[in-house]
């Protein structure tokens, strides 16, 4: 009886796993690849139904990524990056459309993460969202928006990239780096450390969305719940993430989740 029971349990488990939503996370450009590398370290991709991809025009950066799934885009870039020019990042994605179409196939939820303002991520993220959307995936972008100190050109590039994403994404979560300075202790950090705080929020946002769909909790959110929320939304979203334990954990987690709205209003982005 025991072998049969164990075999039946394995069949049920395999069946349940086959019904899990196929989630693909695409880290695009330097910031996106940094995020996807962190997600790998956090073991987000331990299950077969959540897969991560590192996508870049910079061959050296891809070589340093621990992910198995890597895509070097842009023949004319020759693996040397996009030089901070989003039009070159977009051209690289167009040149590598066959490879990108292959990795966006058979996807139910596509999460595209990148830093807005540079070349590869800003230019290629919208194209990847378009390909995923064309093949029937629900698309969510999780991106950062530049600090004011990064200059007008990077903010202009970021607006360009966000507009491309708006055309093809169901929802965009924007993490405004400037808002990080409102968090106690961040304002006095060196700029490199402040960037890492932004990267951490990027990683936590993606993990939060993926784990809501794949991890049991007191209140379960399934794929159709998420689809309903997104379909009736405005395309602009906010996410708050909090975690706590012990007495008062509900209040503590709620306060942590409200520390930073990780998606600003359009006015916040413009400012």
Listing of model-derived features with the role each one plays in the protein:
Residues 1-8, 12, 261-271:
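Single conserved hydrophobic/aromatic residue that forms the stacking wall/gate
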Residues 6-9, 13-116, 120-201, 205, ...:
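A cross-family phosphate/adenosyl-ligand binding-site feature
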Residues 211-215, 219-220, 225-227:
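Alpha-helical assembly-interface signal, strongest on the long, hydrophobic N-terminal helix that forms
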Residues 256, 260:
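Phosphate-interacting basic helix/loop segments used at nucleotide- and nucleic-acid interfaces
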């Amino acid at each position: 009886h025991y072998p049969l029971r164990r075999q039946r349990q394995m069949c049920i488990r395999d069946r349940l796993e086959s019904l899990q939503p196929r989630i693909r996370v695409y880290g695009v450009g330097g910031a996106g690849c940094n995020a996807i590398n962190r997600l790998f370290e956090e073991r987000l991709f331990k299950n077969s139904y959540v897969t991560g991809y590192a996508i870049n025009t910079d061959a050296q950066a891809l070589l340093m990524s621990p992910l198995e799934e890597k895509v070097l885009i842009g023949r004319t870039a020759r693996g040397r990056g996009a030089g901070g020019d989003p039009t070159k990042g977009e051209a690289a994605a167009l040149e590598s459309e066959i490879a990108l179409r292959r990795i966006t196939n058979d996807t139910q939820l596509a999460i595209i993460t990148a830093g807005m303002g540079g070349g590869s991520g800003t230019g290629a993220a919208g194209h990847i969202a378009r390909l995923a959307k064309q093949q029937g995936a629900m698309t969510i972008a999780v991106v950062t928006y530049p600090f004011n100190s990064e200059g007008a050109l990077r903010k202009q590039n970021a607006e360009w990239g966000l507009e491309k994403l708006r055309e093809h994404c169901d929802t965009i979560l924007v993490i405004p780096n400037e808002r990080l300075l409102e968090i106690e202790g961040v304002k006095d950090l060196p700029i490199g450390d402040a960037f890492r705080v932004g990267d951490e929020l990027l990683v936590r946002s993606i993990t939060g969305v993926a784990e809501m769909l794949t991890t049991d909790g007191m209140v379960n959110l399934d794929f159709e719940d998420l689809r309903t929320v997104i379909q009736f939304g405005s395309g602009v979203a906010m996410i708050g993430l909090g975690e706590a334990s012990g007495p008062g954990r509900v209040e503590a987690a709620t306060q942590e989740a409200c520390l930073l709205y990780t998606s600003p209003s359009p006015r916040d982005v413009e400012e």
